[in-house]
C-alpha cells in the first residue's frame, strides 16, 4: 500500500481526492469515467513535447520533436498525476518523471500499470506543498487538469514555481470561468454527454487565463504561451485552437 509522505498545510480538497480515488483501475479504461481525458491526452502530450523540445536545447539547437525520445534526460514533475495517464507517455519520450498525487489508490494503480508497461516512474503519494519543502528542482513542472480541483490556486502555483529550476518551465491546463465553460464543461460534459462523472467540476473554481498568469507571476514565472483546446465533433477528438473560453493550456518560464 502507498505510504503518504509527511505534509504540512496543503491545498488538497479531501472530497475531490476521495472522488478521484474511487475511480481506481477505471482510470486506464478508454471507455470509462476518464474517457474524455484519454481523448485529450494526445493533444496534451504533443503540446508539452513541442514546447519543451524548443526550449531545452542541445548544443544550442532545438531538440528534434519527432525523435523517438525528444525529452531524453529532462526531469519532469507531474503534480496531481492521477493514475499516470500523462506520466507514462512522457516517460516513453525519454523524460525522467516524478509523479505525485494525494490519493492512495491512484498511486497504487499508477505503479502497477507502469510496472506492467516496463516504465520507470517515481510515483509518490504526497502533496505539492510537502514536495516543495525538499531541495530538488525539475526542468518542468506540470499541473494539468488539476488547478480547478485545489482549494488554493495561488498557493499551489507558488509551490510549483519553487520546484522549477532557473531557466525551467511550468505548464498548466485548466478550465476558464465563462458562461460558455459552464454550458459545455458542466451541463454538456457531465449531465448531457456523460463524459465525466457528475460533480467532477465546480464552475466557481474555474480559473481565467488572466488569473492564472497573475498567479504564475507571483511565483516568479513568466507566462509566454496561452493556447485553447477545443473538441472537434467531426473528428471526434480534441485540437489546439485560439479559443480559450473553455479549456486552455499555459506555459511559463522561470528566470535563469
Swiss-Prot record:
InterPro entries: SAM-dependent_MTases_sf, UbiG_MeTrfase
Binding residue positions for S-adenosyl-L-methionine: 44, 80, 101, 144
Catalytic reaction annotation: a 3-demethylubiquinol + S-adenosyl-L-methionine = a ubiquinol + S-adenosyl-L-homocysteine + H(+); a 3-(all-trans-polyprenyl)benzene-1,2-diol + S-adenosyl-L-methionine = a 2-methoxy-6-(all-trans-polyprenyl)phenol + S-adenosyl-L-homocysteine + H(+)
Naturally occurring in which organism (per UniProt): Methylocella silvestris (strain DSM 15510 / CIP 108128 / LMG 27833 / NCIMB 13906 / BL2)
CDD domains for the chain: AdoMet_MTases
Keyword S-adenosyl-L-methionine applies: yes
Major enzyme class: transferase
Record protein name field: Ubiquinone biosynthesis O-methyltransferase
NCBIfam families hit by this protein: UbiG
Amino acid at each position: 500500500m502507498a505510504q503518504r509522505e509527511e505534509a504540512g498545510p496543503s491545498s488538497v480538497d479531501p472530497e475531490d481526492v476521495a472522488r478521484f480515488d474511487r475511480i481506481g483501475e477505471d482510470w486506464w479504461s478508454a471507455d470509462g469515467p476518464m474517457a474524455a481525458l484519454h481523448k485529450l491526452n494526445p493533444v496534451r502530450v504533443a503540446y508539452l513535447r513541442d514546447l519543451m523540445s524548443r526550449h531545452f536545447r542541445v548544443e544550442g539547437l532545438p531538440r528534434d520533436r519527432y525523435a523517438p525520445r525528444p525529452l531524453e534526460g529532462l526531469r519532469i514533475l507531474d503534480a496531481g498525476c492521477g493514475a499516470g495517464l500523462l506520466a507514462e507517455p512522457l516517460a516513453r519520450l525519454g523524460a525522467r518523471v516524478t509523479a505525485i498525487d494525494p490519493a492512495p489508490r491512484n498511486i497504487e494503480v499508477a505503479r502497477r500499470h507502469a510496472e506492467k508497461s516496463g516504465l520507470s516512474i517515481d510515483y509518490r503519494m504526497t502533496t505539492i506543498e510537502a514536495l516543495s519543502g525538499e531541495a530538488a528542482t525539475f526542468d518542468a513542472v506540470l499541473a494539468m487538469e488539476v488547478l480547478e480541483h485545489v482549494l488554493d490556486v495561488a498557493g499551489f502555483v507558488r509551490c510549483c514555481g519553487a520546484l522549477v529550476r532557473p531557466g525551467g518551465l511550468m505548464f498548466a491546463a485548466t478550465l476558464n470561468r465563462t458562461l460558455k465553460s459552464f454550458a459545455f464543461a458542466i451541463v454538456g460534459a457531465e449531465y448531457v454527454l456523460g463524459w465525466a462523472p457528475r460533480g467532477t467540476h465546480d464552475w466557481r473554481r474555474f480559473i481565467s487565463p488572466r488569473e492564472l498568469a497573475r498567479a504564475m507571476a507571483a511565483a516568479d514565472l513568466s507566462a509566454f504561451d496561452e493556447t485553447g483546446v477545443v473538441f472537434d465533433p467531426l473528428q471526434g477528438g480534441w485540437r489546439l485552437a485560439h479559443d480559450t473560453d473553455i479549456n486552455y493550456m499555459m506555459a511559463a518560464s522561470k528566470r535563469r
